[in-house]
Structure formats: structure tokens, C-alpha cells
Regions:
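Phosphate-rich cofactor/ligand-interacting catalytic cores and adjacent structured alpha/beta frameworks
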Residues: 165-303, 309-310
């Protein structure tokens, strides 16, 4: 029995990017999704992925959607192909890049990569990396969500088959996202796409953060439920009115087996209790401070209160992609932490700024915060004063 390849997806942090991850999850068992909010972060993210893939024994698939191909990403494409050439037969990784930005074509040509019509896929351009397992496809006429659907055979050769209702909702989602993302104002689906986009931004960071395992399931289920309402004829106003009901129903499902859940609270308050118990959301620094990454300010306030009340930590810090830090504490040490990062505030609520100005992942945030909060002891082995101290004459 041949096991299916592990599939990892890197996608843009917008409606089209999440539409693409929703479609991919409908056809493949995607093991991990990385959402990239800024194109400037794509380079560091793909380099981290390349390091991981170099050490992977079995072949895997990396799916990249709606990211735009800038110079660092194109350099990664070349390094990926070079890595693949050195791997054993049968262990070659697969790279599938689905993009629709005109600027990507210009950048590929500027980096001396041949871009030509794909003879196997009408209407698509393909960049030649001289590797049959590397598919860099560009389609200016369609959004990434539709491309992920139409090119599913590349990342899901034995694709799952959605049920009839799910397939119809998926088609409605694709139509709405494409109308919005390509700004097709004259199409009937545009108004629904705009309402879908508003609901997406109201929900994507305020309930289940991207660093939590529930995140992608929650947002994809929300988009599919909303698409189902649009398919049934709901107006944008009706979708707006019912969005709270959709979110509450999904939260009920997520928390069905959670001990201590209180359904009389708001969805955000209920989720905060569950998130505060999560090991996946935090990294414990060497001084006991718990670090989270990318939580919006309201979520961090609710979750950090629950964490400290439960006795999990006396100090919690949240790092944003833009490099801002928010410290909360119950022992007056939040201000001490913020001062280490050129910040200030109150004794138990303060903020600062990362020395490098930004962070692209929780691991990157930990690497910057740990040595500042908890600097290693100085190495005295090369100091002449240390030698004198130990000399007994």
C-alpha cells in the first residue's frame, strides 16, 4: 500500500487565500496551512519550509496559492528544484504554485525564467524550472480559489469527492470569491462576494487565531456555510444578519466536548476559555513567560486573563507580525518585559517593539524575544580577569 503524500499549503491571508485553502481541504488531507499576511514575509516562510523538506525522507507536496512571485520567492523556486535533483529516485518532492498576478509574470521574466503557455492546461502559463515535479502556473483570468479547484489533480491525485451539497456550496464559494477578487462588479455574485469578504475580515482573527489547530477548520466551515446561504438566495443584508448565528453554531460544534464550557457566555468568551488551556497556542520561555503569536488585541486580552487566572503563567506576551509586543502580568513584571524592548506602559499591561522590527512566525518571534528577556550568562573563559580570579598563586 502506497501512502498519500503529506500536503502542506502556504497561502495568502485574504479571502482568496482562505478560499484556496478551503478548496484544497475539500479534496486533500492537508496536514498544515501557513497563512502569509504580507508578501514581504513569503521569502522567510518558504526558506523555513525548504529547510524542513531537505530533511524529510519521504516525498511531500508543497502547495502555494495566491502569494505573488517576488524575487525572494523565485530564488526559492530555483533552490527547490536544485534540492529535488539531489534526492533519491521516488523521493522527489512536488511543488505546486498557483498564482494569478500579472506582476508575477514580469518578475519571472526579469529573473530569466521562461514563461510559456502550458500545452497540457489551456489558458495557463507555466514557468520552466526543468523539473517535472515543479508546477508554477499562472492564470490572470481566474482567482486562486478557482485555480485550486481546477488544478486539484496536481496536489490530490486521489482526490476526495465532496457530497452533493458540499460540492454545490463549494461552487458558490468559488463564484463569489472570483467575482470579488477580480473586481467583476457587473456579475450577480459580486455583491455576495463583498458580503462574504466583510464577514471573513470580521471573523478571521477575532475568534480562533491562525496559530491554533482549530483555525482553518473554523474559517473554512464558516465560508462554506455562508456560501450555502448565498446559493439559497440570501441577500448581502441577510448574510450579515445571520453571520453571528453561523459563528455561534460553529463554536457550539468546536466546544461540544470541552469541559467547563458555559453556553450562556458570548462566542468569544467561550473560545477564550478553551484557547487559554491550549498547549498549541503558546511557547513557554525559559523564565516561564508564555508567548503567543499573531493574536488580535481583544483575543489576547481575554485569553491572557484566563491563562493567568488558571495559574499557567504569571506573565504572557503576544507578538504581532508587525513586531509589536504586548505584555500582560499579575506580578508587576509586564513593564519590566516591555522596557527590555524599548517600550513602556503599566506595571501589568505594557508594550514594546521587536529589535528586528517584525516576525514572520512564532518560531521567529521566540528567537528574537528569548535572548532579550533571558540573556545567556557572559562567557568569561577568554577574559584575563577570570584567569586572575581563579589563580591561587
Amino acid at each position: 500500500m502506497i501512502l498519500p503524500m503529506i500536503v502542506t499549503q502556504i497561502t495568502h491571508h485574504d479571502l482568496d487565500g482562505y478560499g484556496a485553502s478551503t478548496v484544497a481541504a475539500a479534496f486533500a488531507d492537508v496536514s498544515r496551512v501557513v497563512h502569509v499576511a504580507r508578501y514581504s514575509d513569503v521569502g522567510p516562510v518558504v526558506e523555513d519550509e525548504l529547510k524542513r523538506l531537505r530533511g524529510a525522507v519521504a516525498a511531500e507536496t508543497l502547495l502555494m496559492t495566491d502569494l505573488g512571485l517576488e524575487e525572494p520567492t523565485i530564488a526559492f523556486l530555483r533552490r527547490f528544484a536544485a534540492m529535488n535533483r539531489g534526492r533519491a529516485e521516488g523521493a522527489h518532492h512536488r511543488l505546486v504554485v498557483l498564482d494569478h498576478h500579472a506582476s508575477s509574470i514580469d518578475q519571472l521574466k526579469r529573473q530569466n525564467l521562461e514563461v510559456a503557455p502550458d500545452p497540457e492546461r489551456a489558458g495557463l502559463l507555466r514557468a520552466d524550472l526543468s523539473d517535472p515535479e515543479v508546477f508554477v502556473l499562472i492564470d490572470e483570468a481566474h482567482c486562486a480559489t478557482r485555480m485550486t479547484h481546477d488544478q486539484r489533480a496536481l496536489y490530490a491525485p486521489e482526490a476526495k469527492v465532496p457530497g452533493e451539497t458540499a460540492a454545490a456550496d463549494l461552487a458558490a464559494l468559488i463564484e463569489s470569491v472570483e467575482a470579488l477578487d477580480l473586481w467583476k462588479k457587473g456579475e450577480p455574485a459580486f455583491a455576495g462576494g463583498l458580503a462574504l469578504d466583510e464577514m471573513f475580515w470580521d471573523s478571521v482573527s477575532t475568534l480562533v487565531p491562525a496559530s491554533h489547530p482549530w483555525h482553518d477548520r473554523f474559517i473554512s466551515d464558516l465560508l462554506m456555510a455562508a456560501a450555502g446561504l448565498l446559493r439559497a438566495g440570501a441577500t448581502p443584508a441577510e448574510l450579515e444578519r445571520r453571520s453571528g448565528e453561523l459563528r455561534a453554531r460553529l463554536v457550539d460544534g468546536l466546544l461540544a466536548d470541552e469541559t467547563g464550557d458555559d453556553p450562556t457566555l458570548t462566542a468569544r468568551q467561550r473560545l477564550a476559555r478553551a484557547l487559554a488551556r491550549s498547549d498549541a497556542l503558546f511557547h513557554r520561555l525559559s523564565d516561564g513567560t508564555l508567548l503567543s503569536f499573531g493574536l488580535d488585541s481583544g483575543t489576547f486580552q481575554r485569553v491572557s486573563d484566563q491563562v493567568m487566572e488558571a495559574g499557567r503563567a504569571k506573565r504572557v506576551v503576544n507578538v504581532q507580525r508587525a513586531g509589536t509586543l504586548s505584555f500582560r502580568s499579575i506580578d508587576g513584571t509586564a513593564l519590566d518585559g516591555a522596557r527590555a524592548f524599548r517600550g513602556g506602559g503599566h506595571r501589568d499591561a505594557a508594550g514594546g517593539k521587536l529589535p528586528q522590527g517584525s516576525a514572520h512566525s512564532r518560531e521567529d518571534a521566540v528567537a528574537q524575544v528569548e535572548p532579550v528577556l533571558n540573556p545567556p550568562p557572559p562567557d568569561l573563559s577568554g577574559s584575563p580577569f577570570a584567569a586572575l580570579k581563579n589563580w591561587k598563586g
